[in-house]
Amino acid sequence: TEFEKKLYIARVQTEKILSDDEVFYIPSLSSKVISYKGLIISDHIKDFYPDLTNGKMKTSLCVFHQRFSTNTLPQWKLAQPFRYLAHNGEINTIQGNRNWYLARRNKLNIESLPELNKLHPLISRTDSDSYTLDNMLEFLLAGDMGIFRAMRTLMPPAWQNNNNLNEKLKACYEYPVSYTH
């Protein structure tokens, strides 16, 4: 929605303005997604965030992750979950993906978000691999790409050597390669 786009742009602009502040972080700024963070054990989450026990609070999905990143120094912005993802593990291609983004960021203009096109880079070169993936997913969603297509774009299945793949599906996987590889 337009409101979601405005919230996304406002958050990105604010983060750019305050980029030198190492403790400033906005866990979520959305009318649809709330990201709670806390250095707590799962049994205490209801005490730490009492609004989660309110019967008026309704959700179709909840993700809980209970540890800090293992390959970077602990920081609130790197604590799981992120704005859209919770990911445990290593993304082996992260440096290549970051370099790909930097080389193609001018191609990634989203017509519905002209203000955002001035805010590149949107992907961190130094934060965790999962955080970077979450940033890119958030960018694609803000540009009106659906969640399933965005995830397939960012993490396509191994399809190049599959001779049994029908041509329509192959074309579907080939299209985002111009954006993601």
Q: For each predicted feature, which ranges?
A:
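Active-site pocket-lining segments that scaffold enzyme catalytic pockets across diverse folds
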Residues: T1-N71, Q80, N164, A171-C172
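General structural feature for long, well-ordered alpha-helical segments within catalytic domains
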Residues: T59, F64, L78-P81, N97, ...
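Conserved small/polar residues in nucleotide/adenosyl-binding loops
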Residues: T180-H181
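Conserved catalytic alpha/beta cores of large enzymes that bind or transform nucleotide phosphates
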Residues: N92, N99, N106-N162
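Short acidic, glycine/serine/threonine-rich loops at helix termini
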Residues: L73-L78, Q95-N99, A103-K107
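Conserved phosphate/anionic-ligand binding catalytic regions in large, soluble enzymes, centered on
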Residues: P81-R98
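Alpha-helix capping and helix-loop boundary segments enriched in small/acidic/polar residues
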Residues: L73-Q80, I123-D127
